[in-house]
Amino acid sequence: MISLDQVKQQIQAALPDAEVMVNDLGGGDHLEAVVVSSAFTGQSRVKQHQMVYGALKDALASEAIHALALKTFTPEAWAVARQTA
């Protein structure tokens, strides 16, 4: 099993400016992550997700993370999403 802090640290190691929020959806291996980074600017949603999955590849391969619900935002898109939430 991997801690929520470890997930956050691994994402931030790959995306140093990232704001990362991680929640356990059950069992410790089903997680939800919201990642906000300027590195996502100009990238497709698929590419954004690949960037995060790449940061967590070892945890995913070892099944320390079994399922990951992922939401990615640029800082600008996050500002809009927070206003409409």
Swiss-Prot record:
Family according to the record: Belongs to the BolA/IbaG family.
PANTHER family listed in its UniProt record: BOLA TRANSCRIPTION REGULATOR, BOLA-LIKE PROTEIN 1
UniProt superkingdom: Bacteria
Pfam families xrefs: BolA
Protein known as: Uncharacterized protein ssr3122
